[in-house]
A protein has these predicted regions:
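ATP-binding/phosphotransfer module of carbohydrate and carboxylate kinases, centering on a glycine-rich
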Residues: 1-65, 69-111, 115, 119-143, ...
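Short glycine-aspartate micro-motif
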Residues: 77, 87-91, 145-149, 213-217, ...
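Short, acidic Gly/Pro/Ser/Thr-rich loop/turn segments
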Residues: 95-97, 155-157, 223
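Short, acidic, Ser/Thr-enriched surface-loop or helix-capping motifs
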Residues: 103, 158, 227
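Glycine-rich phosphate-binding loop and adjoining helix at the ATP-binding site
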Residues: 108-212, 338-350
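Glycine/GP-enriched mid-protein hinge/lid loop-to-helix segment characteristic of carbohydrate kinases
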Residues: 111-113, 119-123, 172, 179-194, ...
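Short glycine-rich anion-binding loops that position phosphate/pyrophosphate groups of nucleotides
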Residues: 153-156, 219-221, 333-334
């Protein structure tokens, strides 16, 4: 076994071969010559390193397109072996909380709705029950599960596996990774939900080919995550990306974090629906409010536009701070593509330097109910597949 932080984990990948794994994650199948060129290795060095990975079963060889220089012989392609092992993901602050079983390609193979639990040990027991169900459904042995990733809303000390504070769960200074490991006997890694989403998008999602990108997680809370030069940016204490707590109205409404005027108090689904109710508009979802606005209801239009503009200004400031090539806005509760997102896009364009507009790709994605759990599984996948020091 290999030491990870303060915990023991399963066999990881040697740092000398990390670049091979990263290239295959980014590009899928590659020939040896293309792979060697992309990571700056000689063909002979690449052959030696890849042989070890093939013997371990981590990568596979397959026939590719025909190579005219070799008299019609098909080239041999290398790719990650999707079935080498599996990862568990648990999204604790999803509604409802979900678990998934994923493979080395990030595919969701089985899903499980976790039973409700609030106390950390009860959560660990619920995860253990979920693992039993997931491997039963997929008919795999427990020994092939390589790790558990846990994502939650709040401030997380990833290196120590501690939930420092989560208002959503009512936790403070909970060693949740260690608690889950004791119950499941599996290496467990915990992270902030937005950081988990960023990791998942880099490994298996829309940002695989991006070295510098940002994600904005839009739902009952707003979170952010940034990849800079191909690595997740955590900041000095691990709190980088807390855009939901950018001050947008100095002296404004008090947030659950203790500050006043945070973005979370104006642009989350919770805040928007509360303000809609105060205006006499009784709706249960932002999608319903968008539908009312589409029929010409001026109060709904103004509310959505104002909230969207606030988000847009914050995203614009973030773009100017980090200069990403890509910004992914991930809609986890069904905002849709209406007045809110249109206003967000306009505010971004109106508040960033002109030369950055054409240089920054902006994408909006709506996601499935198990999205956070899938993102959580990528925490464990990253820990196994990528050099430990990259965290």
């Amino acid at each position: 076994t290999e030491e990870i932080g303060h915990r023991q984990a399963g066999p990881g990948i040697s740092s000398s071969r990390t670049s091979i794994i990263e290239a295959l994650l980014e590009n899928g199948s590659m020939s040896r010559s293309d792979l060697a060129n992309s990571i700056g290795l000689s063909r002979s060095a690449l052959t030696v390193l890849s042989r070890g990975l093939i013997e371990q079963g981590l990568i596979l060889e397959s026939s590719g397109s025909y190579d005219n220089q070799q008299t019609g012989r098909p080239s041999i392609l290398l790719s990650l072996n999707a079935e080498h092992g599996y990862f568990i993901g648990a999204g604790l602050t999803e509604d409802p909380p979900m678990m998934v079983l994923t493979d080395f390609h990030g595919n969701s193979l089985a899903q499980h709705r976790m039973r409700d639990a609030e106390q950390p040990r009860a959560v660990a027991s619920a995860i253990e029950a979920g693992i039993t169900e997931l491997i039963r459904v997929r008919k795999i042995s427990r020994q092939r599960v390589l790790g558990i990733g846990v994502a939650l809303s709040g401030y997380v000390d990833h290196a120590r596996g501690i939930c420092v504070q989560s208002n959503a769960l009512g936790w403070r200074d909970v060693s949740i990774a260690e608690i889950i490991e004791r119950v499941t006997k599996l290496p467990t890694y915990v992270d902030n939900d937005a950081h988990a989403v960023a990791t998942g998008q880099k490994l298996f999602g829309h940002a695989r080919e991006s070295k510098n990108f940002s994600i904005v997680m839009l739902g009952k809370k707003i979170g952010g995550g940034h990849y800079i030069h191909g690595r997740l940016h955590r900041g000095h204490t691990g709190a980088a990306g807390e855009i939901g707590h950018y001050t947008v109205v100095p002296g404004g409404a008090r947030c659950g974090c203790g500050k006043q005027g945070c973005l979370d108090m104006f642009a989350t689904s919770t805040a928007i629906l509360e303000k809609a109710a105060e205006s006499g508009l009784k709706t249960e979802t932002v999608a319903q409010l968008e539908s009312i606005a589409a029929k010409g209801e001026s109060r709904a239009i103004e509310l959505l536009r104002h909230a969207g503009a606030m988000l847009g200004v914050v995203v614009a400031n973030s773009i100017q701070m980090n200069n990403p090539e890509l910004v992914l806005i991930v809609d986890v509760v069904g905002f849709g593509n209406g007045f809110f997102t249109t206003s967000t896009r306009q505010a971004i364009e109106n508040n960033i330097l002109p030369h950055l507009i054409a240089k920054t790709r902006l994408e909006l994605h709506s996601v499935d109910k198990d999205f956070l759990a899938r993102s959580a599984s990528s925490i464990a996948a990253h820990q196994f597949l990528i050099d430990q020091t990259s965290y």
